[in-house]
Amino acid sequence: MPEVIELFVVEHRAPYQFLPNNHQSKSDFIETSCTLACNHPVNCLLRTPMLDVVVLFFLFGLLAGLVRSELKLPPALYDTLSLFLLLAIGLKGGVGLAQQSLQPLLPQLALVILLGMLQTLAGFTVLRLKMSRVDAAATAAHYGSVSVATFAVGVNWLTERGISFESQLSIFLAVMEIPAILVGIVLAQGVSRQTRWRRLAHETFLGKGVTLLLGGMAIGYLAGPDGIAPLKPLFVDLFKGALALFLLEMGLIVARQCQDLRRHGLFLLGFALLMPLASAGLGLMIGQLMGLSLGGLTLLATLAASASYIAVPATMRIAVPQANPGLSLSAVLGVTFPFNIMLGIPLYHSWARHFTE
């Protein structure tokens, strides 16, 4: 009578029973059977993390904020992490640009500027159904612009899976901040003599985010891969840890915005969920015109789907002070940002795969 070997599978109270054939040794059989048991669908589900670890940090911060924990990061640390992430992204993009011709970049920049303008106009058209002109314009500008944190999570998501992407995406990140802001201002109040264009230009083109990104790219481009190599332990190896801490603080911030979102109704909630999906689709079409790779398409869709919560609010406070910042920030931070980093990026990647097949 053949020997019965019992292997326990976690989701069953009773053991599975396997019968080895006459051509397998006991050790070979056990190795094969363990592989089969570990590859059981339920076991795979249990062993495979559904969310990236940095997203779990975000969820931890969100939960801590919702239960009104006293957890908080020092403001100086949050600012330092922002600076670090922007520089790291800029350096990586600059090194990539140093290894390719810059001439094909000009038509691509024109396309991403067009993308930001179209998103802002489309968002304004929808929001105008329920909002005042200035609130609709200010909120639309947030959704026509981009989020560095969402981009950083997208970069990490692709890197973890060994998916390459074009280096010029870092330049797109810097450039896409600008057209949405300018279009949003014009939609809100037109071209007026009262508009403080010099101050707005300084805030738009020389804001912290754009300056750090462009500065990092310039350093990476001039230094090249060999020059940046000594900085790898800081800007490459520590990138994921810095992103995790940054997202922990973002979770705490989002928890506060979730409470504000309840006051603004289902219309804003629906817009905050559907606008990223429509923008991602538009981004994929633009990316296909550029001839981007699978990773590049995924990142451009992620950029298009993201919404600004730093550069645009700061500029709109100057240009359109009568707009209600609570409307846009509660939608961006309470809905769009968590949706993108938890569900959106894998979804946009699956859409991008269909575009490349």
Explain the meaning of each model-derived region.
Residues 2-12:
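Extreme N-terminal basic, low-complexity initiation segments
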Residues 4-5, 25, 37:
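Compositionally biased, low-complexity intrinsically disordered regions
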Residues 17-19, 23-24, 29, 40:
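Short hydrophobic targeting helices and cationic amphipathic motifs
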Residues 44-63, 72-76, 103-255, 264-265, ...:
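Alpha-helical transmembrane segments of multi-pass small-molecule/ion transporters
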Residues 83-98, 119-120, 145-153:
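A generic, lipid-embedded transmembrane alpha helix
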Residues 261-270:
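Membrane-helix boundary/juxtamembrane motif in polytopic membrane proteins
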